[in-house]
Amino acid sequence: MGDRVEALAIFRKKQGVLSIDSRLKWTGEGKTTPSVDIAFDAISNLQTTPASNPKVMIRVFIVVKEGEDPTSLVFHFTGTPNARENCDMITNELRNAIQRQREGSQSKPQGANVDRVNSTNLEKDIDLQESLLTNNPDLLQTFKEAVMKGHLSNEQFWSTRLHLLRAHAVERSQQRGPYNVLSTIKPKTVDNQMKVSLTGQQIHDMFEQHPLLRKVYDKHVPPLAEGEFWSRFFLSKLCKKLRGDRITPMDPSDDIMDKYLKDNEEVTKVSDEPIASHLFDLEGNDQNANVIAELRPDITMRIDKEALPFMKNINQLSERLLEKSLGNSKRFNNENEETYLKESGFHDLEEEASDSKVVLKIKGQDQLLENNFVPSKNQVGLEPLPSLEALQHLYQEDSISLNHIEHDSDSLAEAAMQLTQSMREKHEFETHGTASNLPIDIKNEIVLCHTVTIEFLHQFWNALLNTTFPDKKAMAPLQNALLNSKKRVEAIASQAQEQNVDPKLVYELVSCTLTSIDTSISEYQRRMSYPPA
């Protein structure tokens, strides 16, 4: 926000000062607290009189509550010194402040709104619902049958799927972080020729993650064709180095790519870490002592010179990916500096802080401890609790052993047979229809009818159990939807009969669903037969 701007203005026939800093304020003459204090995001419109009008005033429209008409506040500058100049100054500064406020609110990431989504916003977010239906074909089919055919309203359908909408909103707000693109590209050999498929985004990411590759590309393309360059690169030792793979003597040589094997890919930059003093630079002192004394580490502790370049390359790539994800924030540098200062201090030489505890002294403490404890009258006649040995002796005879349990082999065999038969029937229905070779189109119709009917039953019982006495207007469409489901089952049975399939098979598969429909309608009619209390 800019500097504070203020000017004399009249509000409701009272003289005062109109000021703009972080908010729009008007303070009456002789008062310290502002009578008008308005946030910039509450201002919906701004009007001012033209220069030809002798009256100089500003009309500010503010929104007190969402959905209500804006309220106007009028500030007059007529009769004050430099009225027109002050009016223009206040108007321009107020417009700039409102513009900055709106730009700041729009620049916030969309992911921050995910935590604030509630049930009402989810049910009204049509774009989110369309995205979820596009990604879930089964849910889309159910939506078409239940909502688009007029059986359920859009709010009823989504009221039972708020968890799906909320999870999808969180999924959409997440952004994919950077990854090692080069390791995901796998060239293929077709007709003794290597083929590689690259997109523009992949090439851009590789150049951003590997500055050395961008340097080689800019230097040799042209004269090399782009296809030839990428074919030679993916077969070269340079590609294996950037990937972090070990280079072997069997790898083919390339007179262009091999010249860059010893080049360091790390970009030179100014280090944010302070230079360590020789007084407590343990790593530097250790290296210096080894050089002077000509000491070499044990063979198990020596660095593998062949693996060292690959380790450095992978570490540098990981560092670049992290910097891109974190935005190279200075906050981490400040944390590292504070940690460095804490670790470099000689804390063992600091004076110990004195304990500021309060010592509690009791007069006559010895006399209190020497007095014999005399039980009260209520405690004299009580018997002590039995000992643990006495309790164990009481329950020693009736001990329980979990190793000897009576098994009903017939019941176990029957349960296992029923479970196996159920799993076999489910597998046969999902793969081949039924044992009687039910056509696949009939099977799909049955599955869809069952799914939609379950949705109707869910909504039906939610509305029925929501109140003590059901609402006829709300229950009538749901009852009709259940009755239409029974008619649809009859239509599927007729369709099966036309294809020389026994209709009894269809009724057997949906028998539980039909029973649920009859039970629901009977319960609704039973409740409607009782008058409301």
From Swiss-Prot:
GO terms for cellular component: cytoplasm; cytosol; nucleotide-excision repair factor 3 complex; transcription factor TFIIH core complex; transcription factor TFIIH holo complex. Residues 100-119 are annotated as: Disordered. The keyword Glycosyltransferase does not apply. Residues 106-119 have a biased composition (Polar residues). Residues 116-169, 190-241 form the BSD domain. GO terms for biological process: DNA repair; nucleotide-excision repair; transcription by RNA polymerase I; transcription by RNA polymerase II; transcription initiation at RNA polymerase II promoter. One of its GO terms (molecular function) is RNA polymerase II general transcription initiation factor activity. InterPro entries: BSD_dom (IPR005607), BSD_dom_sf (IPR035925), PH-like_dom_sf (IPR011993), Tfb1/GTF2H1 (IPR027079), TFIIH_BTF_p62_N (IPR013876). Keywords: Nucleus, Repeat, Transcription, Transcription regulation. Component of the general transcription and DNA repair factor IIH (TFIIH) core complex, which is involved in general and transcription-coupled nucleotide excision repair (NER) of damaged DNA and, when complexed to TFIIK, in RNA transcription by RNA polymerase II. In NER, TFIIH acts by opening DNA around the lesion to allow the excision of the damaged oligonucleotide and its replacement by a new DNA fragment. In transcription, TFIIH has an essential role in transcription initiation. This is General transcription and DNA repair factor IIH subunit tfb1. It comes from Schizosaccharomyces pombe (strain 972 / ATCC 24843). The lineage of its organism: Eukaryota, Fungi, Dikarya, Ascomycota, Taphrinomycotina.
